[in-house]
């Protein structure tokens, strides 16, 4: 099984930069407190790094 990372949205995307909102949406997060497991790929890591201040990452 491939490595995965748990990502949780902990802050609102209201008033944030459009590309940061797009990264959050690209990770599959919809609302505060929503948690998803994403594959640990360079593409997903890039999205996580761009919007790091809105997220909590485990794993």
From Swiss-Prot:
One of its GO terms (cellular component) is cytosolic large ribosomal subunit. The keyword Ribosomal protein applies. SUPFAM superfamilies: Ribosomal protein L30p/L7e. Keywords: Ribonucleoprotein, Ribosomal protein. One of its GO terms (biological process) is translation. The keyword Ribosomal protein applies. GO terms for molecular function: structural constituent of ribosome. Part of the 50S ribosomal subunit. Belongs to the universal ribosomal protein uL30 family. This is Large ribosomal subunit protein uL30.
